[in-house]
Design a protein with these regions (language model features):
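Hydrophobic/aromatic beta-strand patches that form the interior of the parallel beta-sheet core
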Residues: 16, 40, 118-120, 193-195
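Long, charge-dense
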Residues: 135-162
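PAPS/PAP-binding and catalytic site of the sulfotransferase fold
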Residues: 25-38, 110-114, 134, 192-216
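PAPS-dependent sulfotransferases, especially Golgi type II membrane carbohydrate sulfotransferases
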Residues: 1-15, 155-170, 174-177, 181-194, ...
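Conserved phosphate-donor/acceptor-positioning beta-strand/loop module used by diverse small-molecule
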Residues: 113-136, 198
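Glycine-rich phosphate-binding loop used to anchor ATP phosphates in small-molecule kinases
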Residues: 81-109
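Short His-Asn-centered micro-motif
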Residues: 19-21, 97-101, 123-124, 197-198
Length: 266
């Protein structure tokens, strides 16, 4: 039961949760850590909590509940969705690692529930992220709104209604990463690591793996970094660098100054 799990959460040893917008190599990282001794890595556990993640964003943004109350609500939802996985973790003595981006807005609740938990924030150049979202037709049909966060009052927000798809996906990038930045400010350095997916190399990968305290061989790292997973194909016109200047300006108005903070030129 969930009550039994709550009593044993202290036995869930050093779980790792990736926080991101998605489209940041989450499947790639789950594959990498699947070979690490003593770790059980998940890319898309079921339920994936996409709709619940949107609810988590909404309830925190609305501010209708006290922080403690909203965290309690979100803790119950998170545990209901991950009960069997966390129980497996402590009973089988394998560390839990989840790269699924749909737990991002549960970050505060997870940090409180699991004091041993570590978090990895992965960000990506907003132009590349938006290009990927466009390719997946985000915000072009109703189903997307159930899996991607939207402004709390989006149905009656004239600004949102007037946004192009590029502006909406840019907003998603900025809003998600801004939330994670605020969350990171509440944690000590030994619980959070930030990783730039757009400039990944062997050195930065070494640092990320060291932060998780996982054991992955040098041979495996070198092999993995050459692999590509869940990759989308683009025409030249679809690539951010070849966008019309107006589209780039629309993105920049929304994604700066955070993009500059990350060292991205947009």
């Amino acid at each position: 039961s969930v009550d039994e799990l709550k009593k044993n959460l202290h036995l869930v040893e050093r779980p790792v949760f990736f926080l991101s917008t998605g489209r940041t190599g989450t499947q790639w990282f789950a594959n990498l850590f699947s070979t690490a001794e003593g770790i059980k890595a998940y890319h898309a556990p079921s339920p994936d909590l996409a709709a619940q993640n949107c609810f988590a964003y909404k309830i925190q943004k609305q501010g209708k509940f006290k922080k403690e109350e909203s965290e309690e609500i979100l803790s119950h939802i998170f545990l209901a969705g991950r009960e069997q996985y966390l129980r497996y973790s402590y009973k089988c003595r394998r560390r839990y690692l989840e790269t699924n981006n749909h737990i991002t807005f549960f970050a505060y609740a997870i940090a409180d529930l699991l004091p041993q938990a570590k978090f990895i924030h992965i960000h990506r150049h907003p132009g590349d992220f938006v290009s990927s979202g466009l390719k997946r037709s985000w915000f072009l049909d109703g189903s997307s709104d159930k899996r991607q966060i939207v402004p709390v009052d989006h149905s009656s927000d004239p600004a949102w209604s007037s946004f192009t798809t590029i502006q909406k996906i840019s907003w998603l990038w900025n809003e998600t990463n801004s939330f994670v930045e605020s969350f990171k400010n509440t944690l000590p350095n030994d619980r959070i690591h930030t990783f730039d997916f757009s400039s990944m190399d062997l050195d930065s990968l070494h640092e990320l793996v060291a932060f998780t305290e996982a054991r992955i061989s040098e041979k495996r790292l070198k092999s993995q970094i050459t692999r590509r997973m869940n990759v989308q194909g683009y025409t030249e016109a679809e690539r951010y660098n070849n966008w019309p200047e107006k589209d780039k300006e629309d993105l920049a108005k929304i994604c700066n100054p955070l993009a500059r903070q990350y060292g991205y030129s947009i």
